[in-house]
Design a protein with these regions (language model features):
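Class I S-adenosyl-L-methionine-dependent methyltransferase catalytic core
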Residues: 1-129
Length: 129
């Protein structure tokens, strides 16, 4: 897994070794960001169920102003911090080790784009939308 474009282009990202998490494939991520390419710059991003943080990091690399990362898994939080450090983007990030409901209640600014990719096994897709 890697950052596809922008300031951190080519940066290799770590992912979680877990059966409950599955990273978004690079080709899927690339397609998403091709659609969003003109809507990322200077935006505030919320990456819920962030896992490795790859979606929020890609957005920051492409010019997003700030990204909030939310995951309840301790290993995910550790990996997100590592990946932000590796991509030199940690100063634009806020990380919540909380449930998505708790994290949303702590936000004090307008969010422009939300990435929502929960593990299907949790059964929260409908509720989290």
């Amino acid at each position: 897994m890697r950052v596809i474009s922008g300031l951190a282009r080519g940066t290799k990202l770590n992912s979680i070794e877990s059966s409950s998490t599955r990273p978004t494939l690079d080709r899927v991520k690339e397609s998403m960001f091709n659609i969003l390419q003109n809507d990322i710059k200077d935006k505030v991003i919320l990456d819920l169920f962030a896992g490795s943080g790859a979606l929020g990091i890609e957005a920051l690399s492409r010019g997003a102003k700030k990204a909030y990362f939310c995951d309840i898994n301790s290993e995910a939080i550790y990996i997100i911090k590592q990946n932000l450090e590796r991509a030199h983007l940690k100063e634009k990030a806020v990380i919540f080790k909380k449930s998505y409901i708790e994290a949303i209640s702590l936000l004090d600014e307008k969010i422009d784009i939300v990435f929502l990719d929960p593990p299907y096994k949790l059964g929260v897709v409908g509720k989290s939308i």
